[in-house]
Regions:
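N-terminal Rossmann NAD(P)H-binding glycine-rich loop of SDR-like oxidoreductase domains
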Residues: 1-20
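Terminal hydrophobic/aromatic helix or amphipathic segment near a protein terminus
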Residues: 232, 236-290
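NAD(P)H-binding glycine-rich loop region in Rossmannoid oxidoreductase-like domains
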Residues: 42-93
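Conserved beta-loop-beta element that borders a ligand/cofactor-binding pocket
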Residues: 145-170
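Conserved Rossmann-fold NAD(P)-dependent oxidoreductase catalytic core, especially the SDR/UDP-sugar
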Residues: 93-138
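Glycine/proline-rich active-site loop of Rossmann-fold NAD(P)-dependent oxidoreductases
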Residues: 166-179, 213-223, 246
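Amphipathic terminal alpha-helices
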Residues: 289-314
Length: 314
């Protein structure tokens, strides 16, 4: 059973489950994205899983071996303050309720799609990220909630997902925001960007990680997910080749204070719109300026196979 089975990541996982001989069911909101590669073998029930009664949720979970929570919201979705409440509503409370029901129904393994910000917060406690960023605190809290249901009878895995590339027809790609950022430099002979880098992988590789965890997780595991670790400079050159056919765009490292100054401007912009950002734009400078590189051991353990990241970025 996948909640979020018609989304970008859920449908990629569904296809791999089906290819491996598993039966897959999802509860999804209509309409299906037009032209999206949603496996025809997947059983789709239309509805909002957040609004299911206990009886309906129990009926959906009964007889299932595995449950995947590929739903919820990420830091790009805007909410008024306090933004943590929205994350609790969409990311934490449903995981709490669904995993409790999964346990009651004898589901053997559960997989929750989390964030690489959790990996970062745990790896660098000195950065105090949970205090600065409501979104990161919510993802750590989501992991804690998921962990309490894991035991010898039900394995629970949280995938700490980084940047993911690959698109689904009918949906806005993840990196539209990045393109909007880069358009600010159109008139300049160079692009200014922080000096750090990030972990990343393709949509198909996320699907493989989901299926791998659903087939093998024991007890509780938070998996740090990465297949490629790339500096922003290298990544942006790929984006420019894809976007404008520019072979070797000049990228200039932005000092942290410049990014922080831009963050102060963004704080004011959010305040004007009555939005609280889940990632504080001033504190983001610390994250963007570092090499947020995650070892690839966990993805290898989950059975992730190589893919063409450059083609996926396009």
């Amino acid at each position: 059973l996948i909640f979020g089975g018609t989304g970008l990541l859920g449908s990629a996982a569904a296809q791999i489950f089906i290819d491996r001989g598993h039966h897959v069911k999802t509860i999804a909101l209509p309409p299906l994205p037009e032209g999206a590669p949603i496996p025809k073998e997947m059983e789709i029930e239309f509805g909002n899983f957040l609004e299911l009664s206990d009886e309906q949720l129990e009926a959906a979970m009964t007889g299932m071996d595995a449950f995947v929570y590929a739903a919820g919201v990420d830091e790009r979705v805007e909410f008024p303050a306090p933004v943590y409440d929205a994350y609790k509503k969409y990311n934490i409370d449903p995981v709490d309720r669904c995993l409790a029901m999964a346990k009651k129904c004898g589901v053997k393994r559960c997989v929750v799609l989390g964030s690489y910000f959790s990996w970062l917060a745990k790896t660098h406690p000195e950065m105090d990220l949970c205090a600065k960023h409501p979104y990161i605190r919510s993802r750590i809290d989501q992991e804690k909630v998921a962990a309490k249901y894991a035991d010898e009878n039900m394995g629970v895995g949280v995938l700490e997902l980084p940047y993911i590339f690959g698109t689904q027809p009918g949906r806005r790609p993840v990196w539209v925001i990045l393109i909007e950022q880069l358009q600010r430099f159109e008139k300049l002979p160079f692009t200014m960007y922080p000096a750090g880098g990030t972990a990343m992988l393709t949509v198909r590789q996320v699907g493989e990680c989901i299926v791998g965890a659903a087939e093998q997780v024991q007890g509780f595991r938070a998996y740090g997910i990465s297949c490629y670790n790339m500096h922003w400079r290298e990544f942006l050159k790929i984006v420019y080749r894809a976007m404008d056919g520019i072979q070797d765009r000049k990228i200039v490292d932005v000092p942290k204070w410049t990014f922080q100054a831009f963050g102060l401007h963004m704080r004011k912009e959010y305040a004007k719109r009555n939005v609280q950002s889940g990632i504080d734009p001033v504190g983001l400078a610390d994250i963007m300026g570092m090499d947020l590189f995650i070892p690839t051991d966990d993805t290898k353990e989950l059975g992730c196979t190589p893919d063409d990241i450059e083609a996926a970025i396009f």
